[in-house]
């Protein structure tokens, strides 16, 4: 299993949102490039970077900063506001390893398919964020500001038929809460779509959570708030 540190960017700083709410922001004193270099030195193979300003505005705002983070030598999967072929190509040409496509996959499937065909499916990670208010996980869009009527399962089925292999799934209710991930959701995801390389995010607290997710068949975990805790040894998580 791949352990991927997450860095959320807002106005050039490292931040975390609580349950995706922009009015509940925790800002950290460490600078993004320093944070990326820190994880690279510890042996991380990949970073997950989200441009929150881009996610909110609909156009990536911090590509220059993300490219600077990439110069630390660590591969980056990045998203937040990629809403056109031009933006996708700009990010890809800048050397970003995998582009993270979120809301666009729900609001404009035709354009998303064009991007997938242009960039290639293996270079795309679909970020599908859900609210499980009923038994059916429904997708949220636009930086979690709006709900859609699309279910996770129907959207995954659609894009799997178009070659997508990597999907990052977050239960919004778990994100930033440090109460544990939604294991039932990920178990269903792997059972329904075993050919997808699932990335889990939201609520992961400790090594036991990571081990449990691995036993369910999850391919990668995204670690955010957990890595800002003083008692966490990231090198041990990589073992």
Curated annotation (Swiss-Prot):
Pfam family for this entry, one: His_biosynth
Keyword hit for Metal-binding: no
Pathway the protein contributes to: Amino-acid biosynthesis; L-histidine biosynthesis; L-histidine from 5-phospho-alpha-D-ribose 1-diphosphate: step 4/9
Superkingdom of origin: Bacteria
Keywords: Amino-acid biosynthesis, Cytoplasm, Histidine biosynthesis, Isomerase
Localization, UniProt: Cytoplasm
Gene3D superfamilies reported in the protein's UniProt record: Aldolase class I
Protein name per the record: 1-(5-phosphoribosyl)-5-[(5-phosphoribosylamino)methylideneamino] imidazole-4-carboxamide isomerase
Organism: Legionella pneumophila (strain Lens)
Top-level taxonomy: Bacteria, Pseudomonadati, Pseudomonadota, Gammaproteobacteria, Legionellales
Name of the gene this protein is made from: hisA
